[in-house]
Swiss-Prot record:
SMART domains: ANK
InterPro entries, alphabetized: Ankyrin_rpt, Ankyrin_rpt-contain_sf
Keyword Repeat: yes
Taxonomic lineage: Viruses, Varidnaviria, Bamfordvirae, Nucleocytoviricota, Megaviricetes
Protein name (record): Putative ankyrin repeat protein L768
Length: 626
């Protein structure tokens, strides 16, 4: 152990199997959150016979037992001296975190102390020192300015960072005077534009000294504020009697908030103004046109092919703004619109094209390839004809998107034309858990009285694994619909429902289930130690079966400890498999494995037996965020 003095870094995620993360004293400021004011000094409890202690990474350790020694203030100069300067300069991490910590607490004396010790800002710290401060006081901000000979932060960064913090112009005024005194040339136009862009709660007092005391281009600032919708700045500059031409101003891609502001000030949007707005292709063309339509400023005579082309080029769905209130049929190419509407699955635009003369049957081959089943069903109900050529049928669209009862018209047509069978469709869509009404319909088309669906096993396991989602009503509905659960599926459901006696009876009567790995996996996943004991005994503690049980239990410490303590399987031999399995969604399991020496950073190969088994179920063990 490198040091006998440690501090709590993270408390256990699982109190039943505690793993304490602790850090040694030279890494306290490197690893602790800058908001923390106090830290607990601890030591491993060496009196415990089963004490475990391991190093995770540089300066971070883990143990299962600790004794608390004292609470240590991180705002006490003596503690800071001990934590920082008994060790190397690099050990306490980016120095801006130290300054931000003390500046946020207005502990300027501690900043003095750091400067006396020549603790300079590390590289790229200019913005970070400001970003990590929490509600800094005026005194803290002035401290940075007055000590910038030491900090060496660019003055541009100081302006851009400090102005949003201030609630009066005093600091800004002080900075401007300072720049004049040291003869430092600064681009105040850029400063103001940056502040306007990046400040959500900008007060006019923040920038008033720049406007009043520097030679910035007020008209440029005015236009920029108009484009950003900063109404309080616009109003302030108007009070300064800034000169502008309204027609020129609206060419500058102003926001809808700004436009509404000027309308409320008494400006009338005549045909010239509207023509300028809609033909200047502003970046917010959708919002601008919607505003003009909603406020009844946009009239039929102002709508041009150029405007519609711009709207459509931005997004075909934007055309929906016009189709209900204006006559635009002669201004667009309907054949182009229908193709784009199909591509974007826009039923509203498809309907509009049909109502204006498009023969939808000409496009059904494209629609079958591009559109979701709900749209195809809707078109069938409107009289569209599905072509007889099976090559247009894409079963993957059914598999991925046919989840709701509004797909039934399309399914009915597919089955009638013998493009697919109801039974095959059921097998293909079941893993995506379709609406029960779809299954009820499909089952009426199945020739046999009852069918079994092997893929349903994976659905049950996967839903429970990812979401702890077991909905008995859904499975009861499946049974009522005529789906027959096979013996494997019945057993898995009984395990989930904790019907231990029933499970044992079924397995006794069906020997092939005793070594079934999916049943073992669900048993461990559901914390069924009684069933696990039964399975291990009936398999006579077969080593291959034990190894699978060990690997599956990597996400369940209770089961894992039971297997380790009650069998002779060696976890060290299966580090890779256990680490991959645990890495999926239980980080406290990883902590447990690491503490006990069962962890490795290397995943199993993607073609390993474990990966193949989990892939068959549909569980991605290589993606912890899935």
């Amino acid at each position: 152990m490198e040091s006998k003095t440690y501090y709590i870094f993270r408390n256990p995620d699982n109190p039943n199997y505690p793993v304490y993360h602790i850090i040694n004293e030279k890494h306290v400021f490197k690893y602790t959150d800058f908001k923390i004011k106090e830290i607990i000094q601890v030591e491993p409890d060496y009196s415990k016979p089963d004490l475990k202690f391991t190093e995770y990474e540089d300066g971070i350790y883990a143990t299962n037992y600790i004794n608390e020694i004292a609470k240590i203030s991180l705002l006490d100069v003596n503690n800071i001296d001990k934590l920082l300067f008994n060790f190397s300069y690099e050990s306490f991490g980016p120095t801006y975190r130290l300054y931000s910590r003390f500046l946020s607490d207005n502990r300027l004396d501690l900043c003095d102390y750091l400067i006396e010790k020549n603790i300079k800002l590390t590289q790229f710290a200019d913005y970070c020192i400001f970003n990590f401060m929490v509600n800094p006081s005026k005194e803290s901000l002035m401290y940075i300015i007055d000590h910038n000979d030491f900090f060496q932060i660019s003055w541009e960064t100081i302006f851009k960072s400090i102005i949003p913090f201030t609630r009066d112009g005093e600091i800004t005024d002080y900075l401007i005077t300072l720049m004049d005194n040291i003869n430092y040339k600064i681009d105040y136009d850029d400063i103001i534009k940056n502040v306007i862009t990046n400040s959500y709660t900008l007060d006019i007092k923040n920038i008033e000294p720049i406007i009043e005391k520097t030679n910035i281009n007020l008209y440029d600032v005015f236009k920029y504020a108009c484009s950003r919708g900063k109404l309080h700045i616009i109003d302030y500059l108007l009070d300064k009697r800034i000169e502008y031409d309204f027609y020129e101003l609206i060419k500058c891609d102003i926001s809808t908030r700004t436009l509404n502001f000027f309308i409320e000030k008494g400006y009338y949007l005549d045909g010239i103004a509207i023509d300028i707005i809609i033909n200047s292709e502003p970046h917010n063309i959708y919002k601008m046109v919607k505003f003009l339509i909603d406020q009844k400023y946009l009239t039929q005579d102002l709508i041009t092919k150029q405007l519609l082309d711009t709207i459509i080029k931005t997004n075909i769905n934007n055309l929906r703004l016009f189709i209900n209130d204006f006559d635009v049929v002669d201004l667009v190419d309907l054949d182009m619109i229908i193709v784009m509407a199909i591509e974007f699955n826009s039923m509203e635009l498809i309907n509009w094209c049909m109502n204006n003369g498009i023969n939808i049957n000409k496009y059904m081959s494209i629609i079958m390839k591009k559109c979701r089943p709900t749209i195809i069903s809707g078109l069938i109900e409107l009289g569209a004809q599905i072509p007889n050529d099976k090559s247009y049928y894409d079963p993957t669209i059914i598999e991925n998107y046919c989840m709701g009862s509004d797909c039934i018209s399309y399914l009915k047509t597919i089955i009638e034309k013998e493009f697919d069978t109801a039974e095959n469709i059921i097998h293909n869509i079941i893993e995506n858990r379709p609406h029960i009404e779809i299954l009820k319909y499909l089952l009426t088309e199945v020739q046999t009285e009852h069918i079994t669906i092997p893929k349903l096993t994976n659905v049950i396991i996967r839903n429970y694994y990812y979401d702890n989602d077991y909905c008995p009503e859904y499975y009861e509905d499946l049974i009522k619909s005529g789906i027959q659960f096979d013996i494997e599926q019945q057993t898995i459901i009984q395990i989930i429902e904790k019907k231990i006696v029933d499970v044992q009876g079924v397995i006794f009567s069906n020997c092939e289930l005793s070594s079934n790995l999916k049943i073992l996996f669900v048993t461990i996943m559901t914390d069924n130690i009684d069933i696990l004991e039964f399975l291990l005994e009936i398999n006579k503690y077969n080593q291959d079966y034990l190894q699978w049980a060990l690997i599956f239990s990597s996400n369940n410490i209770t089961i894992l400890e039971y297997i380790i303590n009650n069998t002779n399987v060696n976890p060290i031999s299966f580090k890779q498999e256990m680490s991959t399995m645990a890495g999926h969604n239980n980080y406290y399991s990883i902590d447990y494995l690491r503490l006990n020496g069962f962890y490795t950073n290397n995943d199993v190969p993607t073609d390993s037996k474990l990966a193949d088994f989990m892939n068959e179920i549909g569980i991605d063990i290589f993606n912890p965020n899935f």
